Design a protein with these regions (language model features):
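Bacterial N-terminal signal peptides that target proteins for export
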Residues: 1-10
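Generic, low-specificity signal for short hydrophobic/alpha-helical stretches with a mild N-terminal bias
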Residues: 4, 33-36, 316
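Hydrophobic alpha-helical targeting segments used for export or membrane insertion
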Residues: 11-16
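Solvent-exposed loop and capping/linker segments of extracellular ligand-binding repeat ectodomains
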Residues: 22-25, 70, 74-583
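Thrombospondin type-1
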Residues: 22-83
Length: 583
């Protein structure tokens, strides 16, 4: 017993010595933090630092509450708490049966982690976020609940930090500049493409997708799909109109197909979608809005519907690679489409080194390329810019039944070699041949036939430097001053109408002119009418020698006799015979 007591005393002394030695000599080189109380979303926790050698407790620290982490429904992913924002200020709408959000009851620039706009307040629905409601607020996530259908203009004015945004399927109207001054990290839309098409955006700064770093939309499985990974969109027939700015920011789209039932494509609907290569429009579509496909620089193929009536200005501006247009209607319908400006025509911005191909359905309902244009006899008017930049078009025939031709109808038709048309100009007040070409007659054009000319006006063929042959018939009675002046490649002209006078310098400087046919109705050659026609070889006068000699000549270069080698008149048998120029 005595020995046991002595052993216990010795052991106690030794342990005391060890701990005293550690406390005096341990440098606490290895420590660790040990959690005593875990922090929750709302409660602080605690932890202490301890030496791993001597286990001495060196200090304690508070663990701050974690805060809620909300999903896109405003439910905390850790504790299940449903977000509410008591600081939201509401205002009763004029209908007295719904509320709108008008602000936050916090000091300016105060930080709030997550704001969830509820669907109800005071047992009435919340339907709207008012103008400037969240101006100058600081938060990192905004969740807008289902049932809210409108966000007023400038709702996030001066919100110059990055946030996440959750938009409900119910949203139907987003006013001007809602996202003009905001940086969006992630945008989540709780609806499908079809639902998205029902949102009305007032301007480009109303659409959040173009402002977001990442954006997501629900797919057919009701799962979020990153918009950046969507390559093809099919617009369902339940959508009557694709709204303005609808797909602004959907940069990954490569193909768009419109189902039967869609009638209109709004302004800037697909503007800036630079990866789209093909657009297929349903035959129910009647109009394409301003800048609808502006900046679609990869677009090569377009299928246009048979019922299209109007293509607004700049609809295809900066679509520089369009080479194939497939039209599902008849040629007479194409002539009646209203192209508001040059960039309404899908070929206008095409790189001039590319050949454009325009296809129409033939009798077998198969696409056939149009290279030789014959306007149907039931067409009365050809609208402006209808065939602009059809640079693979080789020939054109327009019947006398056409009464009006719009401006720039054939501008940019750089492969055109011959054209037959009823009049010079537009058929009304414009009387210049170059009018239908945007005053840039293609250098490829060699042969022109006018079948029902009402007049041949002053400088009517100005700029036709490459045209080689012109035939004119109709009821015109005079060839006005300088009508063909400077047509330096013109080598043959036939005048079949009952012209009475060929006026001043009408053919001056037509230095390649070798042959001309003149009607017997001519009574006068004006001053210098044939000045410098140095290549003139044959003159065919459709009258007798007596009629030829009776023509009034104003000066030496008025008459083709000054240059012609041979002049022919009709004999009694109505056959050409050469006359002696010297007698």
């Amino acid at each position: 017993m005595k020995l046991r007591n002595i052993s216990y005393i010795l052991l106690t002394i030794m342990m005391t010595f060890v701990f005293t030695s550690c406390n005096n000599k341990c440098k606490h080189k290895e420590t660790m933090w040990i959690v005593d109380v875990n922090a929750t979303c709302t409660e602080n926790g605690s932890k202490h630092e301890e030496c791993t050698i001597c286990h001495e407790k060196l200090g304690t620290k508070e663990i701050k509450a974690l805060g809620h982490t909300y999903d896109n429904q405003g439910i905390c992913t850790r504790c299940g708490y449903e977000s509410t924002t008591d600081e939201i200020v509401y205002e009763l709408n004029p209908d007295n049966i719904s509320y709108k959000v008008v602000g936050l009851r916090i000091e300016k620039n105060t930080f709030v982690s997550t704001i969830k706009v509820p669907s109800e307040y005071n047992n009435l629905p919340v339907t709207e976020i008012g103008a400037n409601a969240f101006s100058d607020c600081y938060f990192i996530k905004l969740i807008i609940s289902e049932g809210i259908n409108k966000i007023d203009k400038d709702a996030f004015n001066y919100l110059r930090h990055s946030i996440d945004l959750v938009l409900p399927k119910s949203i139907a109207n987003i006013e001007e500049n809602v996202f003009g001054d905001i940086y969006l990290n992630n945008v989540y839309y709780n609806g499908t493409i079809e639902d998205w098409c029902n949102i009305k955006f007032s301007n480009s700064a109303s659409n959040p997708i173009s402002k977001a770093t990442n954006s997501y939309i629900l797919d057919e499985n009701n799962e979020y799909k990153e918009i950046a990974k969507i390559s093809e969109i099919v617009i369902p027939g339940t959508i009557n109109r694709i709204g303005d700015y609808q797909f602004l920011g959907f940069d990954s789209i490569k193909k768009v197909t419109f189902s039967e039932g869609v009638k209109e494509i709004g302004n800037s609907a697909f503007a800036g979608c630079e990866n789209i290569t093909k657009v297929e429009m349903a035959n129910t579509i009647t109009s394409i809005g301003v800048s609808a496909f502006a900046g679609n620089s990869s677009l090569t193929d377009i299928v246009l519907p048979s019922n299209i009536k109007t293509i607004e200005s700049k609809a295809f501006t900066h679509c520089g690679n369009v080479t194939n247009v497939y039209y599902n209607g008849a040629l007479e319908d194409w002539c009646n489409i209203e192209f508001i400006d040059q960039a309404s025509n899908p070929f206008y911005y095409n790189d001039r080194n590319l050949t454009n191909h325009f296809y129409m359905l033939n009798k077998n309902s198969k696409y056939e390329e149009l290279t030789k244009l014959v306007i149907p006899s039931n067409v009365k008017k050809i609208n402006s810019r209808t065939f602009s930049d059809f640079n693979n078009l080789e020939s054109i025939v327009i019947p006398n039944t056409v009464e009006t031709i719009g401006e720039q109808v054939f501008s940019g038709c750089t492969s055109l070699t011959n054209i037959i048309l009823p009049f010079i100009g537009d058929g009304n007040n414009i009387n210049k041949f170059g009018y239908i070409f945007g005053n840039h007659v293609p250098s490829s054009l060699k042969e022109v036939k006018i079948t029902d000319a009402k007049q041949i006006a002053e400088r009517a063929f100005s700029g036709c430097k490459e045209v080689e042959s012109i035939t004119i018939d109709g009821v015109a009675t005079s060839i006005e001053d300088e009508a063909f002046s400077g047509c330096t490649k013109l080598n043959k002209i036939e005048i079949l109408c009952n012209i009475i006078s060929i006026n001043r310098q009408a053919f001056s400087n037509c230095t390649s002119l070798t042959s001309i046919t003149i009607p017997n109705t001519v009574k006068e050659f004006g001053h210098g009418a044939f000045y410098n026609c140095t290549s003139l070889t044959n003159v065919y006068f459709r009258g007798t020698l007596e009629e030829w000699r009776s023509i009034r000549i104003m000066n030496a270069t008025s008459t083709p006799e000054s240059y012609a080698e041979h002049i022919y008149v009709l004999d009694k048998n109505n056959e050409y015979v050469e006359i002696d120029i010297n007698n």
